[in-house]
């Protein structure tokens, strides 16, 4: 049954699992009110920066970062990737056992990392790959279109290239076989993550910056709550 408040939800728990929209929400809901009882393990799947993850680990000794790679369809089938990061090996192993069903279809996709910040970095790397390849897919379509190729022809020509993964993931949206609303992984969500990447890097990330510009154009057009394939569909 649903609890009336977060405090009621965690009362008596041995392990608390959260998945929220970004680090600011984690601070508001969990850190500032001191939500996690002393001695209780806290597995948080929210996408945050490495700096945020390190701060949460310092604030809550039971913190284990458990970001996931994948969207709703693979989640329903136990096909997510999961990074489990924390300095306490015992807590990390316990949490790994609990979240193992998230990656049940491919257990090798569950990876333990010895710090929460390391797990956060892994998640940003995974989403960086999505951001820059959707930008590459968009630019490939623009190049092909400028030379008279159809969308179908560009999709076919991108087979067996470095963009094949993102093309196979998103071509059904591009070719009208699926609607971009509701989104599996929204433009708002990946734009948020791209900003975390840029803030976390100690150097310029021009490909990420280009991807973010495309995502922000979709947000400005009112399509932030659509699947991030809107970048190619509404290019």
Feature annotation, model-predicted:
Residues 2-64:
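Rossmann-fold NAD(P) dinucleotide-binding segment
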Residues 13, 60, 158-161, 215, ...:
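A general structural motif at alpha-helix termini
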Residues 15, 21, 25, 51, ...:
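Amphipathic alpha-helical hairpins
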Residues 31, 48-127:
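Rossmann-fold dinucleotide-binding core
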Residues 41, 62, 81, 204-206:
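Proline-centered loop/turn at the N-terminus of a beta-strand
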Residues 118-208, 212-229:
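Helical "substrate-binding/catalytic lid" subdomain
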Residues 229-235:
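Short, amphipathic C-terminal "tail helix"
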